[in-house]
Regions:
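Conserved hydrophobic positions within beta-strands
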Residues: 40-42
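Bacterial N-terminal signal peptides that target proteins for export
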Residues: 1-9
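Short aromatic-glycine-enriched beta-strand elements
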Residues: 48-59
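Short boundary/loop segments of OB/S1/cold-shock single-stranded nucleic-acid-binding domains
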Residues: 22-36
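OB-fold/S1-family single-stranded nucleic acid-binding modules
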Residues: 101-124
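Short nucleic-acid-contacting surface segments enriched for D/E, G, S/T with interspersed K/R
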Residues: 79-96
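Short, structured beta-strand/loop micro-motifs enriched in basic residues and often containing a Trp
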Residues: 72-80
């Protein structure tokens, strides 16, 4: 009986130890609550697990190129929303709306992407 209790207690403690960091991984505290919109040129779309990665260039107010990145949701969620690895391609001109990193880094939590043709690739529909 003591062995069963010890195994149960160890399992619960392990779950609690791992649970906190995994929830923090999916938190958005690192991003500002203020929305911004940037004009960007897509450099690369990595349609990979566990999260799709988007790399793009943005011209700052001085006209200099800044290299930005964003992490989207899982590829299977985007696929259910109609996305494929070919939805966006390098060189595409896109408008990105979302919340930027609080630390001033060139990272953004994307809420919507608008293509040069005006097509809206909303992530709200995919995530809801």
């Amino acid at each position: 009986m003591r062995t069963k209790i010890a195994v149960f207690a160890t399992t619960v403690l392990a779950a609690l130890a791992v649970g906190g960091p995994s929830l923090a991984h999916h938190g958005f505290a690192a991003y500002s609550s203020e929305s911004v919109t940037v004009q960007a040129t897509l450099i690369e779309l990595r349609f990979v697990n566990p999260h799709v990665q988007l790399y793009f260039d943005v011209k700052n107010t001085d006209g200099e190129l800044e290299h930005w990145q964003a992490e989207l949701t899982a590829p299977n969620k985007l696929a259910r929303g109609g996305w494929t690895q070919h939805t966006l391609k390098p060189g595409d001109q896109i408008q990105i709306s979302g919340q930027v990193a609080r630390n001033g880094g060139h990272s953004i939590r994307i809420r919507e992407i608008v293509t040069a043709t005006g097509e809206s690739l909303s992530l709200r529909e995919v995530l809801d």
